[in-house]
Amino acid sequence: SSESDKTDTKTAKDETVYVLANADGSVKKIIVSDWIKNGLNEKSLKDKTDLQDVKNVKGDESYVMDTDNMRVWNADGADIYYQGTISKELPVDLKVSYKLDGKTVSADEIAGKSGKATIRFDYTNKQYSEVNIGGKTEKIYVPFAMLTGLMLDNDVFSNVSVTNGKIINDGDRTIVAGFALPGLQENLNLSKDKFEIPDYIEVTADVKNFALTTTLTLATNSLFNEFDTSKLNSADDLQAQLNELTSGMTKLIDGSSELYN
């Protein structure tokens, strides 16, 4: 995921979080890359971060710690690009589960097997605030859109389908991208019987000697900038707003698919 922290009109920090995960979705390591944009060509830049093992990844600028526990970079007019690690909880939890011929199996158990496979990505939004609504405490979740992409070898995977997503087949491989909106169902206090907003992605396929290489997941909340809940007066209004979100995710999926070509 990526976010910008603007300190003034000429200086900003872009932060991208990379999560290296195990086959079940559990976190192996979190790497954070920061870019401090030195629009004012300052000689030094102050920066506050919780990262550990911070290192400059694009130059030889160094830093010192000041009395406020801030890093003061000797920028000499340049932008600063650095990287570090962190162990804090992620705002969205990802769980990856597998089935083979309808039976739940582990990642190790499905490896090398053949049959009807299902790969399911479940997302749990953990970032929320508690607010009082009508005398009752409610959880209001920070909205996140999740995009997961897979590149599947057509010698292994065939007859691929996905819920809440798109499939592109170039002959040698199948690119799958799906999206989910965890926490939005709860924010809107909407019954799944009336309207279900996806909080998971499920990929099914016939497999031969199952082997899954890299999967990529992107989390973003920028798509919700135009999502106005005050305009939701009917199911049609909700459908229109969700259609806009879906359109935005489709564009993101199309853009992500281009990266594989």
Annotate the PLM regions.
Residues 1-260:
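Cytosol-facing boundaries of transmembrane alpha helices in integral membrane proteins
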